[in-house]
Structures are given as structure tokens and as C-alpha cells.
Amino acid sequence: MRYQRPKGTADILPGDSQTWQFVEATARQLFANYRFEEIRTPMFENFEVFSRTSGDTSDIVTKEMYDFKDKGDRHLSLRPEGTAGVVRAFVENKLYGPETQKPYKVYYMGPMFRYERPQSGRQRQFHQIGVEAFGSDAPELDVEVIALGMNLLGKLGLTHLRLAVNTLGDQETRTAYRQALIDFLEPHFDELSEDSKVRLHKNPLRVLDSKDKHDQELVADAPSILDFLTPTATAHFDRVKASLDALGIDYDVDATMVRGLDYYNHTIFEIMADSPALGEGYTTVLAGGRYNGLVEELGGPEMPGVGFGLGVERLVLLMQAEQVAIPDNHPLDVYVVGIGDQTSLATLKIVQAIRQSGLTADRDYLDRKPKAQFKTANRLNAAYTLTIGEQELADHTANLKSMATGEEISVPLADIYQDFQNVVATKFTAK
């Protein structure tokens, strides 16, 4: 029987994986520049970690969680997003204490799991890269996180980006706005989708995020949260906008934008790309915001946080659509050609010596003729070939050839075994 991968998953094969490695390496380097350090959390957590943080009415909790009971009757869930697990680790390991530098800045990357309809750039097992910063409610930290996201996408070769920002205000703001939304939508209750009917009194802000077209038409004329901001919330958002202006980062204020998770407050943002690879119009690639109550929700003290997450599958699709050049970080330096049965052990030793000197090397393992081996070296774009036949074996030498110039020299095997990099640097004029 031939087995296939589960629906909503993908095999990332060599060739494609180079792009993923480039994304991850670029992210790691940039995160280090911003002084974010890596954190790794389990791929499954107690179910309540996600149900308490994502919100009981969110699509993630109500429709998309991969949750199960283990043999100890513990209710567990595969992680549907990265933030909740990071916050749980922050609280459990008491990283909120005074001995830990604040803001406490970390990043993560890895697979997440949601049961949703697979489509372009959206899988049931998908990969997310994200950052979180705890311990400061400064609007400038919001902007640092936004700038980091914009910088990352730019370094990965994406253009035609649009940054949308909004504020969900503080608790007083949302309480007043929540009631205003209910008052506005209640007369249209029978026209709402079934999901929005459930959400109207539990979390009416989520109706604004409905994918139902009729819901979208109804909320088009809804009150704006910007009209309900407290002076404190207004001051925070004004500083965010002023900081973005100071950095020369273009943005639009989208007063209708809410995030798909219930834990956000104050600043929220989405970075979108305009590419046919993900359908018509702008599509969100990276999104995040501030979540000042999340640490408390998971048993910690009052501690503000801000972060973002991006979907790697969507990002890779965009990079491919924009034909972003991926550097070859592992070119083949030397292909070793062995001629004759007697040279097999010597070829093995030579390849190992070249690798130990810090260069990349390969050889034939299929008993191919010399001509076929040289063709392989050409196809693999080897910088050099190193050929050893029975005569060279008897003379304790090998022939080193530059594939770029055709220049060829004879090299003692002892020199190759001792330091092949030095051989290339001192005895070979064609680099």
C-alpha cells in the first residue's frame, strides 16, 4: 500500500528547503540585531492554555483546535499559534521577576496546527515565526516590533507591502465600544450569520472580523472604536503614530481592523502584500499587537507584552512569486574523481580530508565511468575536480583542476591530507 501525507500537510523537499533555511537564517540574524533570543516551547500544551488566551468565541477554539485526551485523561492540544505557549513558559519559569532584564525579548519558529480548509499558503500543519517582548507598555516598543516585521520582510525581498494599524484601546475603551456595537447590531440580529449571533453578546468585536459577506455589509456602517478611546488610549496611539512617522514607516489607520485572537488591546497591526500568489488584493503576511492582560490570564502578575507572528508558507509563496534570489550557502567546492577499483579507499580518505579542512566535497558511489563522473562534477557546479587514478595512487599524488579556467596541477596526497585549503591557497593560482 502506498501512503500519502495527511491532508493539509506538505513535504518540504531539498530545493524548496533552501528557501526555508534562508528565511530562518535571515530572521535569526535580524532578531539578534534587535536583541531577541530564541525560545522553544512544546508543540502541545494543556488545552486551557489556548482556550483561556485565544478566547472561547474565537474560530481557533470553537472550530480549529487539534485537541485530545491522552492516556492519563489530560486534555491537551497541539499548538494553534505561538504566543500562548511562550506566555505560559514566561509565567511558569518566573521570568517576570526583577532579576530578568526587561523588556524580556524572545523569538520562536516552528510548526503550528489548525483544522481548517487547506488552500494556497494555508495548511493544517503550518509554520510560524514570531517575536514577543514582555515588561514594557511603552508605545515605542510597539513600534520597534512593527519596524522589525517590516525590516524582516524587506530583507527577504518582498516589495509592495502595506502596513495597517489600529488601536483596540484600554479596558474602558472596549467596554464602551462593546456596548455601542451591541446597540448598533441588535436591530439586525436576525440578519447576522449564525457565528455572529453567538458572538454578539460574548464578544461583539469579533463580528467585525466575520468572513460572512452579509455580516461585512452590516458592520460597514458600525461605530468606529476611534470615537470611544479614552485619553490614555488616545495618547498611546498618538505616540505609536508619531514614532512610525519618525522612522519614515508608511502606514494606514484601519479603524475596522481587529485581530483573530481575543487577547489584544491597544496597538494592533497587519503587514499585507499585494501578490496574485495569494489571490486578489492585499493579503496579510505578518500580524500582531499588544496584549497587556495575557500574562495575568495564565497566572502571572500584571505584565504588558507585544509581539507578532508570520506564516512561513505564505511568505515562501510570495518570495517565489517575486522571484527572490536565494543564495547558495553550500556550493560544491571539490568533486573527487576516482579511476579504477584500486582508488576507492584513497578517494574515501581524500573526500574526508577535504571536508575536515572546512570545504565541501563529494564523490561517485555508483561505479560510473570517469566521463560520467566529470559530467556529474559539471552538473553540480563543482569549483574543482580532484582526480586520482592507479598511476597517481602509485605516485602518491592527485590532479587538481579548476573547473572555471581549466588550469590543472599535481598535488602530493600528503599535502591534501594535511591541509587542503592551504593547497588551494598556495599552490593554485586560479581561484
UniProtKB/Swiss-Prot annotation:
A GO biological process held by the record: histidyl-tRNA aminoacylation
GO terms for cellular component: cytoplasm
InterPro entries hit by this protein: aa-tRNA-synth_II, aa-tRNA-synth_II/BPL/LPL, Anticodon-bd, Anticodon-bd_dom_sf, His-tRNA-ligase, HisRS-like_core, HisRS/HisZ, HisRS_anticodon
EC class: ligase
Alphabetically ordered keywords of this record: Aminoacyl-tRNA synthetase, ATP-binding, Cytoplasm, Ligase, Nucleotide-binding, Protein biosynthesis
Entry-linked CDD domains: HisRS-like_core (cd00773), HisRS_anticodon (cd00859)
Catalysed reactions, semicolon-separated: tRNA(His) + L-histidine + ATP = L-histidyl-tRNA(His) + AMP + diphosphate + H(+)
Keyword Magnesium among record annotations: no
GO molecular function, one term: transferase activity
Annotated localization: Cytoplasm
SUBUNIT field: Homodimer.
Stated family: Belongs to the class-II aminoacyl-tRNA synthetase family.
Protein's name in the database: Histidine--tRNA ligase
Species whose genome carries this gene: Levilactobacillus brevis (strain ATCC 367 / BCRC 12310 / CIP 105137 / JCM 1170 / LMG 11437 / NCIMB 947 / NCTC 947)
